[in-house]
Amino acid sequence: MENKVVEEKQVDKIPLMSPCKMGKFELCHRVVLAPLTRQRSYGYIPQPHAILHYSQRSTNGGLLIGEATVISETGIGYKDVPGIWTKEQVEAWKPIVDAVHAKGGIFFCQIWHVGRVSNKDFQPNGEDPISCTDRGLTPQIRSNGIDIAHFTRPRRLTTDEIPQIVNEFRVAARNAIEAGFDGVEIHGAHGYLIDQFMKDQVNDRSDKYGGSLENRCRFALEIVEAVANEIGSDRVGIRISPFAHYNEAGDTNPTALGLYMVESLNKYDLAYCHVVEPRMKTAWEKIECTESLVPMRKAYKGTFIVAGGYDREDGNRALIEDRADLVAYGRLFISNPDLPKRFELNAPLNKYNRDTFYTSDPIVGYTDYPFLETMT
C-alpha cells in the first residue's frame, strides 16, 4: 500500500508540467525556452555549436523560442547574432532545427529588427540606422559593466519606406519555415524597431504611423498581418513589452498600449501572444510594481505566455491563478539545460554566470552547464 501511495505521488504533476494546447500544437508541459541572444553566430551565420545548445534544451512537446534573428542587413545592432535573410543562413539553421525536432521539440524563430539600437559600423555601407524617429539613444554601458555601446543617430523612415520593412519581416518568416521552424515569433519588445513605433516616448511621427495609439501600433499590426498571410496565423506569435523601458523606449500609458495590442491581435488567431512582466523595467532589474498583465490576459483570446524573472514557485502560481497559459524562462534555462526536469523533481538549480552570456566561446557558458544525471 505504501508503494502505491508513493507511485501516485510521483505522477502528480505540478502545473508547469501539465500539457497545454497552443493552437495546433500539443505541448507536453508549460516551461518555455525564452528567446536569448548569445552572440555566438559568427558573421551572422548560425553555427554548428548551436545544434548542441538547442538540443540540450529540447524536450518532447516543449516549446523553444529561438534567439533574436535578424531579418535584413539594416536590422543588425550587435555582433555575431544570427540572421535569416540569406540562403546561407537558412541552410545553417536547418541542422539546428532538425536537432530540436529529433527530441520532439517545437521550435519558433524570433524575427527581429533593432531599429535605432545600432550604429553605422553595423549598417550596410556605413549608413545611419533606421527608426520611426531621428532621435538617438544615449551611450549605454554594456552588460559586462565595462564597455560602452555607442549609437549612431538614426534616420527617420519615410512613410513610403515602411512597407519595405514590413516585407522584410514577411520574407524572414517564409525563410524560417523553409529552414524547418514550426513558426515565428515577431519581436515587438524591448525598445527595438517595432517597439520604437509603438511607444509614445520614442515615436514622434505626424503621419499615419504616429500620434494616436492606433497609428503607433499600425506598423506592428501590418507586420503581423503580412507574416500571418505568408505562413499561416497558426504559425505566428508575437512578443511585446508595453511596460518596459528597455533602450529608452517607454510609454506614458502602457496599460492602454498593452490592451489595444492584444485586442487588435485577437482577430488574427495567432499561435500565441508573449508578454514581458511589468516588473522587468530593464534587462536585469526586477522591481516591485502594482501594474499587472491580468487585464491583457483577460482581453486576449488565445494562448498567453508570460516572461520576466519567473522561478518554479512563481511560474506554478501564475498558472494556478490563470494569469498565463505558458511561462517563458531565460537565465534559468541558460544554466539548466534540463530545466523542465528539474522543476518536475524540484531539484536544485545550477547558478548562471552572467559573464558568459554574451561571449563568443562556443562551449563555456553555452553548452557546458551540467545536467542532473552528471551531478550525481
Swiss-Prot record:
Keywords: Cytoplasm, Fatty acid biosynthesis, Fatty acid metabolism, Flavoprotein, FMN, Lipid biosynthesis, Lipid metabolism, NADP, Oxidoreductase, Oxylipin biosynthesis. It is found in: Cytoplasm. It comes from the Eukaryota. Its main location: cytoplasm. Its EC number is 1.3.1.42. Induction: Seems to not be influenced by wounding. GO terms for biological process: fatty acid biosynthetic process; oxylipin biosynthetic process. The active site is at Y192. It is an enzyme of class 1 (oxidoreductase). CDD domains: OYE_like_FMN (cd02933). InterPro entries: Aldolase_TIM (IPR013785), OxRdtase_FMN_N (IPR001155), Oye-like (IPR045247). Its cofactor is FMN. Substrate binds at S143, H187, G188, A189, H190, R279. One of its GO terms (cellular component) is cytoplasm. FMN binds at P35, L36, T37, A68, Q110, R239, G309, G330, R331. The keyword Nucleotide-binding does not apply. Pathway: Lipid metabolism; oxylipin biosynthesis. It catalyses: (1S,2S)-OPC-8 + NADP(+) = (9S,13S,15Z)-12-oxophyto-10,15-dienoate + NADPH + H(+). GO terms for molecular function: 12-oxophytodienoate reductase activity; FMN binding; oxidoreductase activity. Constitutively expressed in roots, leaves, cotyledons, cells culture and to a lower extent in flowers. Belongs to the NADH:flavin oxidoreductase/NADH oxidase family. Specifically cleaves olefinic bonds in alpha,beta-unsaturated carbonyls and may be involved in detoxification or modification of these reactive compounds. May be involved in the biosynthesis or metabolism of oxylipin signaling molecules. In vitro, reduces 9R,13R-12-oxophyodienoic acid (9R,13R-OPDA) to 9R,13R-OPC-8:0, but not 9S,13S-OPDA, the natural precursor of jasmonic acid. Also reduces N-ethylmaleimide and maleic acid. This is 12-oxophytodienoate reductase 1. It comes from Solanum lycopersicum. The lineage of its organism: Eukaryota, Viridiplantae, Streptophyta, Embryophyta, Tracheophyta.
